[in-house]
Design a protein with these regions (language model features):
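SAM-dependent transferase fold signal centered on methyltransferase-like domains
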Residues: 1-127
């Protein structure tokens, strides 16, 4: 299993069945993907891997997480689909603090990178 040092162009979120089966290490190795963090179960790659069993997103921007960022983010992203992986706040807590409404074409992933840095990753669905 390879762990990424920096985010690349694409973000991969495995189907729930894959996570429950425990095959998340195998899929990363076979498809040459980099894991964001040991406990995040999110992956990244430079080039698109269309065979991935799950959702694929194109990374648009990455924000370093802070309380100040949450308050400012609503002005730029009033509506988004939020997901958390290996992150101290729940989706409900993030929504409450940021006032970002559910829906739209933007997907925000709140997660922790291998370095321990907490980030929000702005993406749009690719596949």
């Amino acid at each position: 299993m390879q762990v990424c040092q920096t985010l690349q162009n694409y973000l991969y979120e495995p189907h729930a069945a894959l996570l429950k089966s425990g095959a998340f290490k195998l899929i990363a190795t076979r498809l040459n993907l980099f894991k964001l963090h040991r406990h995040s179960h999110l992956y990244t790659s430079e080039s698109l891997c269309q065979d991935f069993p799950g959702r694929i997103f194109t990374i648009e921007e990455t924000y370093e997480f802070s309380g100040k960022l949450l308050k400012q983010l609503y002005r730029h992203i009033p509506k988004a689909n939020l997901t958390t992986r290996n992150f101290p706040l729940t989706v409900a807590e993030l929504r409450k603090r940021s006032n970002i409404k559910e829906g739209g074409d933007i997907y925000l992933f709140a997660t922790t990178l291998y370095s321990g840095q907490r980030v929000l990753i702005r993406t749009h669905k690719t596949h």
